[in-house]
């Protein structure tokens, strides 16, 4: 019984190989590009490989269907599989390392300011204040007395001469101006600073009137004229002054006092004229 089954299986296998080789040769002869010898050789190798693959697939199917628990019957190369997996994983690892570099923490700390928690609230730490030397403070104070605002060239020149940055000079002038305004409102500025700064209206001298003359007029030759005792000044104002709105009778004495001082000058001139 077994001999009959073996003979039938071999006949079926031979018929399958023959039919496959015949179909391959027939199709290959129809192609105009390949010669006959090449077609025959290729059909032989393809037919043998096809038969081997078919037998292997049938054996795997049979072992899987009748013996599902025996996985050892399936032939595969675990070494090749492991090497392929390792090589692909290694390639992925190198790509990840080159494409995504890890950021450095010190750079973040340098760019971001330090933050401290004060009463449960974040607060940025201020930079330390600039400590000016006595020479720098004296030079800045002298320049502030001359002018309270500096142009860009002046600020750059002053900063270079004192060894400071322009920002430090700018901040010093801003703080000094605010302090000066606060003292000026409270009336605590000394007299020398008022005259030097020139901001207060009282520091500027009052404008001199056009008709005011010095108390001791001088002649052309440089000799002073001796004053003569005169009576009380005339408080009566001329008639043309009453036409102006700015004139008041209380100011008549102050405006007419210089005119009384001119009288000795004219009288002395007249007396000298009579001598000659």
Curated annotation (Swiss-Prot):
Localization of this protein: Nucleus
Sequence segments annotated as region (Disordered): 97-123, 191-238
InterPro entries for this protein: Distal-less_Homeobox_TF, Distal-less_N, HD, HD_metazoa, Homeobox_CS, Homeodomain-like_sf, HTH_motif
Signal peptide: none
Any single biological process term in GO: tissue development
Alphabetically ordered keywords of this record: Developmental protein, DNA-binding, Homeobox, Nucleus
DNA-binding region: 125-184
Compositional bias of kind Polar residues: 218-238
Main location: nucleus
Superkingdom of the source species: Eukaryota
GO molecular function: DNA-binding transcription factor activity, RNA polymerase II-specific; RNA polymerase II cis-regulatory region sequence-specific DNA binding
GO cellular component: nucleus
Record's keyword annotation contains DNA-binding: yes
PANTHER family, per database record: HOMEOBOX PROTEIN, HOMEOBOX PROTEIN DLX2B
Family named by the database record: Belongs to the distal-less homeobox family.
Protein name (Swiss-Prot/TrEMBL): Homeobox protein Dlx2b
Organism: Danio rerio
Gene symbol of the encoding locus: dlx2b
